[in-house]
Amino acid sequence: MPTIQQLIRNSRQPAENRTKSPALRACPQRRGVCTRVYTTTPKKPNSALRKVARVRLTSGFEVTAYIPGIGHNLQEHSVILVRGGRVKDLPGVRYHIVRGTLDAVGVKDRRQGRSKYGVKRPK
C-alpha cells in the first residue's frame, strides 16, 4: 500500500486493456495470403480435424486463421480476408477467415445462417 506522499509523487496508472487481435492493428478486417493450409486437432475433450490456414497479413504479421463451414477451396497463395475471433478449442487460433470474399468461396448448399458463410439467397 503506497503512502499519500508516494501517490503525490507519481499517481496511479490506469490499467491498459490489450487487444485480443493485435495483428489486425485496430482494423475490422485485414487482407492476407495463405502460406499453408492444413488441418489440426482440438484440445481435450473434443475430437475433430479442424481446417486452418497460416496467413501472411498486409500488416506484416503471420497468423493462424480458422476456415469456418463445411468444405473450402483455399490453397497456398489464395488471397483472403481475415477477421478477429478466436476458436476456443484450438490454441493459438485467434482469427477467422471471411467466407464469400476474395478467393474464399461461400459454403455450398448452405440454407441457414447464410450471412456468416458468404452465401447468397437461394432462388
UniProtKB/Swiss-Prot annotation:
Coiled coil segments of this chain: none
Disulfide bridge positions per record: none
GO cellular component: chloroplast; small ribosomal subunit
One Gene Ontology molecular-function label: rRNA binding
Biological processes per GO annotation: translation
Region described as Disordered: 1-23
Family statement drawn from the similarity comment of this UniProt entry: Belongs to the universal ribosomal protein uS12 family.
Protein name: Small ribosomal subunit protein uS12c
Species the sequence originates in: Staurastrum punctulatum
Lineage of source species: Eukaryota, Viridiplantae, Streptophyta, Zygnematophyceae, Zygnematophycidae
Gene: rps12
